[in-house]
């Protein structure tokens, strides 16, 4: 499609009704080029061209303007040159085909009307030949033709002229051939037989000349009537004589041929010479388009020669100059309205045919490549100055567009046609003509209806089924203006690199050097809010990838979030970059480093919560460590005091110093509630001072009104605690009163430096200060001063300001603060237990007034519950010993309730608690390592203590009292160490005499001993309780247990003979007492106690005897002294050796817990009294016998063993033993092993060593005997009281009856609203419990705080299943070997199974006298098992409840009970 068609468009367009494309040369699609002319084309002057029936003049405007429904047989040529009036077809005759319909299309344009007029007359002539004369061509001039008015109703020719036989050449073919020549060439070739050979002109001049020639008879052109009738109208065709069906078929065929691009030479009826002379444009033939055919080359050279000839003839023709000038001037005016770009050629550059030009002159071909074999209408440039279809279009630029606008508005000069033609070179014009390449773009008349006449064009190649996009052609120029040639762009001014890029390769096995670290896949987020939870932060991180681990960093001091979050992303690739095989199926592998990098870029600077987070990548934890360190330093800096101490402390100091942080100038706040440590409560309330260096240089007068108003209330409360005398005292002459009630801030303007310097110079000797206190009888507080420290009196006064001392003096050893009464001094101790000044912790020691007799002796006033006792009594002489003074005390109830405290207070509290624990550990270490071995060595039988005990047991009944006194002295000498209790040994007394007086004396002594024993038991229980409660760590029990083990290991070296010797001696003692007929019960109990104590110390042989003592203590009756026959003597002796009374066993266990040394002196003493003699020997004779041990008869363990065997044989048979009568050693060992197995003990090792025996099971009861954590709930129970035992038994029976009647009824009786209320309270505040090893069975549950009676302890949680399911689970557990099941029955149908799912409540053990009971509560329709405290439970006491198993001792599967309580039922 030529560029001109896109450039100017058409005012009206039409489409064909047929399938082929409509020609661009259709008269219905051309613009009205004559609208710009002064006149319109006149109608045909011939009468044969006129008709009374001209339907075009009577048609409506719509029909005239748009004839889209009409058929057109014109081919689809690409351009139409409507404005080129001087475009001549060729020198030879041209043929115009008749239109398809019976009427000829004649577009006659008018200035005021665009109607198309049609002539209904039929053409009767087959051919109309053009006139070969020049006078019939354009010699009359185009201007006259344009200026002439149309002759609408002119007179027609006479019949003579019409009937003339001469054929006449029609001048219309020459005057108005522009619209005819634009018809497609195919029409001229195919319908040559329909063309009229005679064309007539319509100008008046031509008609006048013809009439003149006719009148003169000289005209040879006058046509005959036949020819005139034959060529009456061009619009008439012989096709109307054909059948319509045949015409339609031919139309379809021609349309099909044109659409397929086929052409047949047989349709052309012209001679071969005429066909080659007349150029035909055919876009369908590629050979002609490309100019490769021989005919195209020949025609191209011929056309060039004809162009030169035509140009030469045009320049020589004088008659054509005025006409051409007029035509060019007229078209110049038209060009002013239609601008054209300068790159395109206008109509002046086209070769013209002038009237005097030869007929064979043909214009040059427009295609340089010879695509057109002959000049055609499409080769001329359009009237608007646009270039041809194949012309090379240069890129439109702004300069060219400006030049186009300038040339379009410039008036053409009035130069002659010669100058115009001479100014343009035909060869240059030919070169400027480019080949056409727009056949693939839709033509304007093929555009949609809404896009026609608007200068629109398609933006892409037309494709069937694809919607095309149309835009204005003017926009294309705007887009192309910005297009630039990238080759002409300037080079970038970039700097050259100084070095080459370093190549990076993936490290593999062939690489050298150290393997590089993997890329980081840890992401660290900082600057987060401390209130954000981890799940809130993960919401921002999870969208980036899968997370392997995450952690929110916590401040170790205060337990608050640091605002630092660490995330590790999952990595699913190995070292070689391959996905891991362990990755789940269907999961996409993730590269942790890439995900971490993307997350870091996305999260850095994002708002998370209320802050903007900062993201960092961390490879091995270095980044997060630095961030945590910086954050902790920042937090510490915020809490750092702003007031600097006056003088830094010295480097070396003998006093314990605590680094302080902050301290207010008023009474110190309470100690924060730190980790719970269960220590006995202090007898009196006390307040701890918080470490603060702020008051180091703060004078008591130098604090602002703001601080005064802040602490005024606390200050007044502390003042009210003091005596009323403080408010009315005045300054004395000899006293320096440091506080004046009337003027508390009178000296506020005095500089602190001057006052401190003044006070610093006042330093008195300690004797002078003490003499002053002695004279005034003032109790005082002594504050020792550390060495090499610079603490002045002003700082101490500021610390003691809340308690208002009379004066504060500085001595050589410390500071002294005087008070009026001891109550004020004790109050100062309560408020200020320790003082923290300048980083030093100073202890406050309350002392009474110095004594008049002993000025140097002073006594410490206790700060406990006896602190309010007046200190008027004389002070006892002070013992010179170094006591461990921790300076700490357990937190009070008020301190426990405090929750708001600063970091400095927390630091001080933690330091004091650690100091307390270290002091306790040190005391226990001294007991176990220093005192314990010393006592063990002292109480050995061959040592001093052992001999004293032996003498006291045999001869002197009063000596044990002195031994106890000596033991008391030892207890005082070793500080707070608690020695083993020897009350049982002290209660032992000699055998009864045979006389009545001795019997009476013995009875009186026995009563007195019983009373002492009860008092001693009560005292020991109290000591035991204090000791158990004060222990806050399990290490204390571990240390004591280690001490006991050490003592036992020392005793393991004793041989079996020595062990059996002691047993034989005891048996001899019992046998002699039985034969003598004694009936002393206490003596027998004492001997049994001696054996039990020895057994508890040496586990070699006697440990096996104690196995079942705890389990059968309730069923064993007391051993009564009676005369035993010889037949039953051995059996009785063995029973006494195997079984000891329960009281003795309990005492033995307690003794082993407190590192009781070996005490076999009483056994030796008893054995010494044993004598082998007849049964009826008098008491006097017995006392005269020689002791075999003292006589040297028994020297070692072997002698003792054989002596025992001999005595057993003698008692059994009544005969002396000999070699033949003694039993075999193997038989004795087997018998002893059987006895041990029957007693439940550990059997004897067959190999002689436990290491070579392998693994064997130790019964739980055997383990329980050696556990240090004895049940604290039963240790302090008084064995003498049977009321509680009976009450417990009644309760157990009542509980059993309730269980039989139904737990549901029991629930309704006990579950009240109060219980539900307590259960709701437990949800908010749970009891502090812990689990640890229990002597009853495996693990146990212990209380960590005091639980009052009736409070809810814990809920029993587990899976709620039906009874049938619980039975099956129990069997399944037994098959799996799991005998520790946790099934708790709720009612008759439901059971709670806590075996796999539950809480620590399942660890509660059974006890026959429990301290908890279970209740079933119904909350929201759901049954809950809740455990309540039955009695008050102390801290450290084990929680137990009754399992209520319905079994007895007769059952085979009865489970023995190991609770060890006085009311134990022996079986569960």
From Swiss-Prot:
Subcellular location: Nucleus; Chromosome
Record's function text: Catalytic component of the COMPASS (Set1C) complex that specifically mono-, di- and trimethylates histone H3 to form H3K4me1/2/3. Binds RNAs which might negatively affect its histone methyltransferase activity. COMPASS recognizes ubiquitinated H2B on one face of the nucleosome which stimulates the methylation of H3 on the opposing face.
Similarity comment text for this entry: Belongs to the class V-like SAM-binding methyltransferase superfamily.
Top enzyme class: transferase
Signal peptide range: none
Protein name: Histone-lysine N-methyltransferase, H3 lysine-4 specific
Keyword annotations: Chromatin regulator, Chromosome, Methyltransferase, Nucleus, RNA-binding, S-adenosyl-L-methionine, Transferase
Highest classification ranks of the organism: Eukaryota, Fungi, Dikarya, Basidiomycota, Ustilaginomycotina
Biased composition (Acidic residues): 1072-1085
Species of the source: Mycosarcoma maydis (Corn smut fungus)
């Amino acid at each position: 499609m030529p560029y001109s068609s896109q450039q100017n468009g058409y005012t009206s367009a039409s489409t064909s009704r047929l399938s082929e494309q409509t020609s661009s040369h259709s008269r219905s699609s051309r613009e009205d080029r004559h609208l710009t002319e002064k006149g319109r084309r006149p109608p045909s002057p011939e009468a044969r061209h006129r008709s009374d029936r001209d339907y075009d003049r009577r048609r409506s405007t719509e029909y005239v303007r748009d004839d889209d429904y009409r058929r057109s047989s014109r081919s689809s040529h690409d351009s139409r040159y409507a404005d080129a009036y001087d475009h001549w077809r060729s020198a030879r005759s041209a043929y115009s085909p008749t239109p398809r319909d019976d009427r000829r299309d004649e577009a006659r344009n008018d200035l005021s009307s665009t109607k198309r007029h049609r002539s209904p007359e039929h053409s009767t002539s087959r051919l109309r030949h053009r006139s070969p004369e020049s006078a019939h061509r354009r010699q009359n001039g185009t201007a006259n033709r344009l200026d002439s008015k149309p002759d609408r109703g002119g007179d027609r020719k006479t019949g003579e002229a019409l009937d003339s036989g001469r054929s006449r050449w029609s001048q219309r073919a020459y005057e108005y051939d522009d619209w005819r020549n634009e018809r497609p060439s195919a029409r001229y070739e195919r319908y040559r037989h329909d063309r009229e050979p005679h064309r007539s002109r319509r100008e008046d001049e031509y008609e006048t000349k013809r009439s003149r020639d006719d009148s003169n008879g000289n005209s040879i052109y006058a046509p005959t009537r036949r020819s005139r009738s034959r060529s009456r109208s061009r619009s008439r065709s012989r096709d109307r004589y054909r059948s319509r069906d045949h015409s339609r078929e031919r139309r379809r065929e021609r349309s099909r041929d044109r659409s397929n691009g086929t052409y047949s030479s047989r349709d052309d009826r012209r001679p071969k010479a005429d066909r080659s002379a007349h150029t035909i444009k055919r876009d369908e033939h590629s050979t002609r388009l490309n100019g490769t055919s021989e005919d195209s080359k020949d025609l191209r050279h011929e056309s060039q020669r004809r162009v030169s000839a035509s140009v030469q003839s045009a320049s020589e023709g004088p008659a054509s100059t005025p006409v051409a000038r007029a035509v060019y001037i007229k078209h110049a005016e038209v060009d002013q309205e239609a601008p054209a770009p300068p790159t395109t050629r206008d109509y002046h550059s086209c070769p013209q045919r002038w009237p005097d030009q030869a007929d064979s002159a043909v214009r040059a071909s427009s295609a340089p490549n010879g695509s057109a074999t002959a000049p055609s209408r499409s080769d001329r440039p359009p009237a608007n100055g646009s270039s041809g279809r194949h012309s090379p279009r240069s890129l439109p630029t702004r300069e060219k567009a400006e030049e186009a606008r300038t040339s379009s508005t410039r008036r053409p000069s009035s130069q002659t046609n010669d100058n115009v033609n001479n100014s343009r070179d035909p060869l240059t014009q030919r070169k400027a003509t480019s080949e056409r390449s727009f056949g693939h773009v839709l033509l304007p008349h093929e555009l949609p209806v809404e896009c026609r006449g608007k200068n629109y064009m398609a933006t892409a190649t037309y494709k069937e089924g694809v919607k095309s996009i149309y835009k204005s052609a003017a926009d294309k120029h705007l887009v192309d203006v910005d297009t630039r040639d990238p080759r002409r762009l300037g080079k970038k001014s970039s700097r050259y690199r100084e070095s080459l890029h370093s190549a990076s390769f993936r490290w593999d096995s062939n690489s050298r050097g150290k393997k590089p670290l993997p890329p980081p896949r840890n992401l660290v987020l900082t600057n987060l809010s401390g209130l954000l939870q981890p799940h809130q932060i993960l919401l921002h991180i999870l969208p980036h990838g899968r997370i392997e681990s995450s952690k929110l960093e916590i401040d170790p001091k205060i337990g608050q979030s640091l605002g630092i979050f660490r995330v590790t992303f999952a990595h699913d690739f190995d070292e070689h970059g391959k996905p891991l095989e362990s990755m789940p199926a269907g999961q996409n592998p993730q590269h942790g480093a890439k995900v971490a990098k993307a997350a870091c870029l996305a999260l850095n600077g994002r708002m998370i919560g209320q802050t903007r987070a900062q993201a960092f990548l961390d490879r091995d934890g270095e980044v997060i460590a630095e961030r945590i360190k910086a954050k902790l330093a920042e937090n510490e800096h915020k809490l750092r005091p702003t007031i600097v101490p006056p003088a830094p402390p010295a480097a070396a100091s003998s006093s314990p110093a605590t680094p302080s942080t902050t301290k207010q100038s008023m009474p110190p706040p309470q100690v924060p509630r730190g980790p719970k440590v269960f220590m006995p409560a202090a007898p009196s309330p006390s307040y701890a001072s918080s470490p603060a260096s702020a008051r180091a240089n703060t004078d008591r007068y130098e604090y602002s009104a703001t601080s005064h108003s802040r602490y005024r209330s606390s200050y007044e409360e502390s003042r009210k605690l003091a005596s009323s005398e403080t408010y009315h005292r005045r300054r004395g002459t000899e006293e320096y009163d440091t506080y004046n009630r009337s003027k508390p801030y009178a000296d506020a303007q005095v500089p602190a430096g001057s006052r401190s310097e003044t006070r610093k110079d006042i330093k008195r000797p300690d004797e002078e200060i003490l003499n002053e206190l002695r004279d005034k009888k003032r109790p005082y507080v002594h504050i020792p001063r550390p060495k090499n420290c610079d603490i002045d009196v002003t700082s101490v006064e500021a610390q003691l300001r809340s308690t208002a001392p009379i004066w504060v003096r500085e001595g050589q050893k410390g500071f002294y603060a005087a008070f009026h009464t001891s109550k004020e001094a004790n109050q100062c101790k309560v408020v200020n237990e320790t003082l923290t000044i300048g980083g030093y912790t100073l202890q406050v020691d309350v002392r009474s007034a110095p004594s008049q007799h002993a000025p140097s002796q002073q006594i410490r006033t206790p700060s406990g519950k006896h602190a309010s006792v007046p200190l008027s009594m004389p002070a006892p002489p002070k013992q010179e010993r170094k006591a461990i003074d921790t300076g700490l005390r357990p937190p009070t109830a008020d301190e426990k309730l405090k929750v708001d405290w600063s970091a400095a207070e927390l630091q001080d509290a933690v330091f004091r608690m650690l100091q307390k624990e270290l002091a306790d550990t040190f005391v226990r270490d001294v007991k176990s390592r220093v005192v314990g071995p010393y006592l063990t060595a002292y109480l050995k039988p061959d040592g001093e203590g052992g001999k004293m005990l032996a003498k006291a047991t045999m001869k002197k009944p009063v000596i044990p009292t002195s031994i106890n006194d000596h033991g008391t002295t030892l207890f005082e000498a070793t500080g707070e160490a608690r020695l083993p209790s020897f009350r049982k040994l002290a209660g032992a007394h000699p055998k009864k005499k045979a006389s009545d007086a001795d019997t009476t004396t013995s009875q009186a002594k026995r009563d007195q001993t019983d009373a002492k024993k009860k008092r001693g038991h009560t005292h020991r229980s109290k000591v035991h309780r204090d000791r158990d409660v004060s222990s806050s760590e399990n290490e204390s029990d571990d240390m004591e247990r280690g001490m006991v083990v050490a003592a036992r290991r020392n005793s393991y070296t004793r041989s079996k003979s020595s062990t059996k010797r002691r047993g034989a001696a005891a048996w001899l003692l019992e046998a002699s007492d039985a034969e003598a007929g004694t009936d002393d019960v206490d003596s027998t109990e004492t001997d049994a106690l001696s054996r039990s104590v020895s057994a508890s110390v040496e586990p070699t042989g006697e440990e096996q005897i104690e196995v079942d003592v705890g389990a059968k203590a309730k069923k064993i009756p007391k051993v009564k002294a009676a005369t035993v026959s010889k037949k039953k003597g051995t059996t009785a002796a063995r029973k006494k050796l195997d079984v000891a009374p329960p009281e003795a066993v309990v005492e033995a266990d307690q003794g082993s817990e407190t590192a009781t040394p070996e005490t076999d002196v009483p056994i030796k003493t008893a054995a010494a009294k044993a004598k082998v003699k007849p049964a009826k020997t008098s008491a006097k004779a017995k006392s005269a016998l020689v002791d075999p041990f003292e006589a040297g008869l028994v020297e070692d363990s072997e002698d003792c063993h054989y002596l025992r065997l001999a005595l057993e044989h003698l008692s059994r048979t009544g005969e002396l033993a000999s070699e033949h009568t003694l039993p075999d050693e193997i038989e004795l060992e087997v018998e002893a092993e059987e006895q041990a197995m029957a007693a439940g003990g550990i059997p004897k090792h067959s190999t002689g060593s436990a290491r070579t025996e392998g693994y064997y099971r130790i019964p739980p009861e055997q383990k329980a005997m050696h556990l240090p954590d004895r049940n604290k709930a039963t240790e302090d129970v008084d064995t003498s009281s049977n009321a509680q035992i009976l009450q417990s038994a009644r309760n157990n029976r009542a509980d059993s009856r309730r269980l039989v009647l139904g737990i549901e009824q029991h629930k309704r009786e006990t579950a009240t609203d109060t219980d539900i209320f307590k259960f709701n309270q437990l949800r908010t505040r749970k009891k502090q419990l812990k689990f640890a090893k229990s002597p009853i069975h495996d693990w146990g549950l212990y209380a960590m705080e005091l639980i009052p009676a009736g409070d809810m302890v814990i809920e029993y949680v587990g899976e709620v299943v039906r009874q049938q399911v619980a039975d099956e689970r129990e069997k399944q557990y037994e098959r799996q070997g799991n005998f520790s099941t946790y099934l708790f029955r709720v009612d008759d149908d439901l059971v709670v199974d806590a075996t796999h799912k539950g809480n620590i409540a399942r660890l509660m053990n059974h006890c026959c006298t429990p301290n908890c009971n279970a209740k079933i509560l119904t909350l929201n329709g759901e049954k809950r098992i809740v455990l309540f405290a039955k009695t008050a439970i102390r801290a450290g006491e084990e929680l137990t409840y009754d399992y209520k198993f319905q079994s007895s001792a007769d059952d085979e599967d009865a489970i023995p009970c190991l609770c060890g309580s006085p009311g134990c039922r022996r079986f569960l």
